[in-house]
Amino acid sequence: MGLSRTMTAIQLNSSIPLGLPVPPHTPHAISVSLPTWSETVAYKEGIKHINDALLNGYPRMFIQLNVRKLSSLLEQKFGINGERCMLFPTYKVAEQCQLFMQARSVGARIVGLLICPEGKQNNRVIECKEPANLSESTSSASTNLYVVLFPPDMFSIANQFWQHSGQGISSRLTDHCLSILTENAAHANGSSLSPLTFPGNSHVAPEQLEVGHDVDLEGRCGGPLLADAAIAKQVLRQRIAGLLIRYGSCDYRAELCVGKKNLEGNQNSRDFADVTENDVYLFPTGMTAIWNAHQLALAVRPTAKSVCFGFPYSDTLKVLQKWGPGCHFFAGGTDSEIDELEIILEQEFARDSTKPPVLALFTEFPSNPLLCSPNLLRLRALADKYDFLLAIDETIGNFVNVEVLPYADILLTSLSKIFSGNANVMGGSLVLNPNGRHYTALKAHIAAHYQDIYYPEDAIHMEWNSRDFEQRIKIIDDNAEAICDFLRPHSVAAGATNAVIKEVFYPKYITPENYERCLTKGTNHDLSSSPSNGGGGYGGLFSLTFTSGAASAAFYDALSCFKGPSLGTNFTLACTYTLLAHFKELEWAAQYGVEAGLVRISVGTENTEALLRTIEAALGAAKEAKGL
């Protein structure tokens, strides 16, 4: 398949020019170089020459150039009065986008296309409803594509669905579609697009598309690829389930039952079921997994507000706010806020004891970017007492370092991050806890309604990338701990005088008791959970706040590593997190400790000493900027 294996030990990279893909020279890279503080600000301010320089971006935040190309072609063909469009892999997802827009009083229509290679199905117009199932629709080189068209001034509304739900067309699927159109355009006869019609959509006659796009495909959607993808997806599900079992503790599982017994632990561990591959569901992005978890809760449980506990990645909160009846937001994720939550639960239950006071509680372990770990023991107790779902996003902690499934009804992970590591493919997973009291209902619904929209070629790359996941975690854990142990004594929080660093946000220092309670015991189930005893580590992510904006900018600019959005890469990647995620709400974020000057660093597998040297140099630049 033309894939190359990534080394677990890599060289520390210098920053690369603005707008180039990160990692460079990588098809379907999912980050972009933002090498300086000022260029990042200019990008967020919409300065034209800066935005024009961007050749890439994080796929949910930045519509990739090949996706823009295909969208433009389809807008020219099917758009009326300058309509814009969004592209989706299935009718079901397109309809969800349409409903999201209609709920905001925006009209949207769907055109379905069957894109066929020359000579397939004679390129005739095919009028039909959604295929019976996705496997039938992708059983050949032909590709179904669903186009949501809407008024041009409503693009920002459609883009919210694209960003929050993460269900837009994959860049690899886009390349496949463009390659078919390119090949077909070279032939004198035949149409490369066949519209499918749906209720409420007018028929659109096919026209020849002229396409001048030269695509270098990594693979083709066809027989062998689909067979490989089916195997890859099965291996991914088995790998995730296997990691949860491998790094789980039999003794530990006996202490929790997710609603089947009390927390004192009086039930034998043999009454507990291990998670299997059939409890693991794959999605095209981590946010798609989160979005679907929320939709699953809305479908299975009585309607109520959700709870967002702890300051989360920005789109998680948006999903809980924009779908369903809204959410209660507890940004600190502290024990005192659990007390506040309990008061709300008591009040709501007193008001109506016939249904749970909340739908579900979503939390990250630990949180991004403040690395705060909530007290899962208390949250699980409340979930049992008041009968609501507990969904835990363990992306930052990861399968190797923390064991949080025993507390969760639903476990969520962005596989795009450290599970992949190569930053060249997106993916997400949702795992149902087989020991949960609501497992049967959740399982029945997802089994009936789950649609596999994970593009085959993406699954193949994800499987390949994740083969050395465990080995990479150990290297990254050690590197990050060495860096944070170096930086912490230079912080105000640690009592340093004339410091430029205010705080080092890292699980070892932020709510360590909650994090360490969930450390994996290691594969030998050593009862002492600590990195030194072969157990889980503190992960590869940390954030820094500074005593001045000038110090923040100087530190960031001086870092000799890749700089741009995303995390969990095999290489060290820094970003101005708050500017990227909350630029239009800086004051709002600051009140919860997410300061505008925060720098987030995802540590890679480079040489430890080389990493320490660049961190020390950046610290020196920050001190100089403050006149120290």
UniProtKB/Swiss-Prot annotation:
Query: Required co-factor?
Result: pyridoxal 5'-phosphate
What protein am I looking at? Cystathionine gamma-synthase-like enzyme iboG2
Family from the record = Belongs to the trans-sulfuration enzymes family.
Q: Which Pfam families match?
A: Cys_Met_Meta_PP
Q: What induces this one?
A: Expression is highly induced during artificial growth in symbiosis with Populus, which is close to its natural condition.
UniProt keywords (A-Z) are: Lyase, Pyridoxal phosphate
Keyword Lyase annotated: yes
Q: Which GO terms describe its biological process?
A: transsulfuration
Supply the source organism for this entry. Answer: Amanita muscaria (strain Koide BX008)
Instruction: Detail which positions bind substrate.
Output: Y313
* Source taxon at top rank: Eukaryota
- InterPro entries (alphabetical): Cys/Met-Metab_PyrdxlP-dep_enz, PyrdxlP-dep_Trfase, PyrdxlP-dep_Trfase_major, PyrdxlP-dep_Trfase_small, Trans-sulfuration_enzymes
